[in-house]
Amino acid sequence: CFSEAEITEKWMYVWKFAILRSVVSNILTNSEWNQDVTESDKNKLLEYANDIFPKYKVPMTIYSEVRNILSHYSTRNSFNEYAEKKEWDEIEIIVGDILKNLSPIYFFIDSVDEEYGHAPMYWLRCQKGLFYRVMRLLRKDTYGNKLHVIICIRDNVMASICESEHHTRYINEEHVKLLNWDYMTIQYFFESKIANLKDCYFINED
């Protein structure tokens, strides 16, 4: 296990690796998006298969990759060894070069807190790690504005971030949007959802 001070940092690594692995799986198997990926580029990534990531048959979600990483590297030593592999830097460069020739890809992470109530402090660290990782991706132009990760975190997680020593970085950050769910906003949300439902979901009053 990791010390309290290390947990958020380790979660940052988990999210980084999960995001990269998910992108790699899409580059290799997403035929609707990867049409401009050359066989040469695919082969560059396949050199790392079964070491850094498995052989993919289908595109994998970031959630799936988080789960797979945690199940395969469940001890302190095994995770640290995985995180310290020099191949990660190589993969990051290769992925960045490939993405430059592709359409932008978007990932949406909005249900990290489904288990929050069962272990709030554990999931607090998880979500903080996600937030810090995404903000670091935003500031690090490795992927040429082609990789976009949109996340949703709980209000108390954001409050904890704003109480940290680095809080000034995120005050008035243009990429952070606070959702204020007043009555009008909730009404608009539900009416928009209802408007998109098919007729078969409505009761015929006749």
Model-assigned labels for residue ranges:
Residues 1-106, 115:
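P-loop NTPase nucleotide-binding core
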Residues 90-108, 112-206:
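The catalytic "switch" region of P-loop NTPases
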